[in-house]
């Protein structure tokens, strides 16, 4: 629960009324729902103080649960599309690829293939036109890492695709998402429409050529 960063566990529909009445209205922590440290046996109210999470830093999922995924203004307020602006106005495509190389960015699949190499190969490949393909299908059983990003932060995916398209010389992009993820598809459609309305997607992005 934000902004206090209180972390409740095993919450069910039956617990919602108590959280609203006691925590949100009464400003009291619902202690019975707090995480209990398995070693000390003590209740830990804050997410950032749980041993398993305290040394972790969210990167891809940093906005998950913190912004409204269907509101582009929430994404902008969290720094969204600033990287796109920097890339388009301050960097060449080659510089973008080199930045990705220095960052050590890799694919999220099991192979962990270096992203810079993939982008460089695409940029240097002969033939035109080129297309940016976002494969949001999850072939591993029980894997939902792509689905979570699409449902919780679709604008981050779109921004990344635009930057990739700029770097590799692609002017069109496609997202492959299975029909079993209707919420992800819905939110992607909303995000795409919003990005187009704000001049962040389509022809002449941010008034560029």
Name each region found by the language model.
Residues 1-209:
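Feature of Fe-S/electron-transfer and energy-metabolism proteins
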């Amino acid at each position: 629960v934000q902004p206090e960063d209180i972390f409740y566990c095993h919450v069910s529909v039956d617990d919602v009324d108590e959280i609203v009445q006691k925590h949100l209205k009464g400003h009291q922590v619902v202690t019975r729902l707090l995480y209990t440290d398995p070693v000390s046996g003590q209740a830990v109210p804050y997410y950032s103080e749980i041993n398993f999470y305290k040394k972790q830093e969210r990167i891809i999922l940093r906005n998950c649960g913190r912004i409204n995924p269907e509101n582009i203004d929430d994404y902008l307020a969290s720094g969204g599309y600033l990287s796109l602006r920097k890339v388009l106005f301050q960097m060449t495509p080659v510089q973008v690829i080199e930045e990705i190389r220095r960052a050590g960015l890799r694919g999220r699949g099991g192979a962990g293939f270096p992203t810079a190499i993939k982008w460089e190969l695409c940029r240097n490949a002969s033939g035109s036109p080129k297309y940016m393909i976002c494969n949001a299908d999850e072939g591993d059983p029980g894997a939902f890492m792509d689905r979570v990003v699409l449902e919780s932060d679709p604008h981050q995916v779109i921004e990344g695709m635009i930057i990739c398209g700029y770097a590799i010389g692609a002017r069109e992009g496609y997202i492959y998402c299975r029909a079993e993820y209707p919420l992800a598809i819905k939110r992607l459609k909303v995000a795409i429409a919003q990005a187009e309305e704000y001049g962040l997607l389509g022809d002449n992005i941010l008034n560029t050529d």
